[in-house]
From Swiss-Prot:
It is found in: Cytoplasm. It comes from the Bacteria. Disulfide bonds: none annotated. InterPro entries: DUF496 (IPR007458). This is Pole-localizer protein TmaR. The lineage of its organism: Bacteria, Pseudomonadati, Pseudomonadota, Gammaproteobacteria, Pasteurellales. Belongs to the pole-localizer TmaR family. Its main location: cytoplasm. The gene is tmaR. HAMAP family: Pole_loc_TmaR. Pole-localizer protein involved in the regulation of several cellular processes. Keywords: Coiled coil, Cytoplasm.
Length: 114
């Protein structure tokens, strides 16, 4: 019985660890979503700004800078989307581990009662 309690306690600790990790991943995903949205807004802002700048203003250098900034922001959006996909995958894996652990714990308790 003591082994069952010890194993049960270890299972609970592992479950809590996984639960916290899952919540951290959810927070990271939310943070990345905000970063994606912010950078998409910056891309739109730069697109609008680019429409107002004309060659008559002799700002070819400014256009080049804006284009570089736009490319940089688009790259960041892509990077955050990739990172979000990785975090979501890890979150799903943790959720499956938690589900399996919960099932195993229930079976362990059932065996202990028998």
């Amino acid at each position: 019985m003591e082994n069952v309690n010890k194993q049960s306690f270890q299972d609970v600790l592992e479950y809590v660890r996984l639960y916290r990790l899952r919540n951290k991943l959810l927070r990271d995903i939310g943070d990345n979503d905000r970063k994606i949205r912010d950078n998409q807004k910056r891309v739109l802002l730069l697109d609008n700004l680019s429409q107002y700048i004309t060659n008559d203003m002799s700002v070819e250098d400014i256009r080049a800078i804006i284009e570089n900034m736009r490319d940089d922001y688009e790259g960041r959006v892509d990077d955050y989307m990739i990172r979000n996909a990785d975090l979501s995958k890890e979150r799903r894996e943790i959720k499956e581990k938690m589900k399996a652990q919960k099932k195993a714990h229930a079976e362990l308790l059932k065996k202990a009662d028998d």
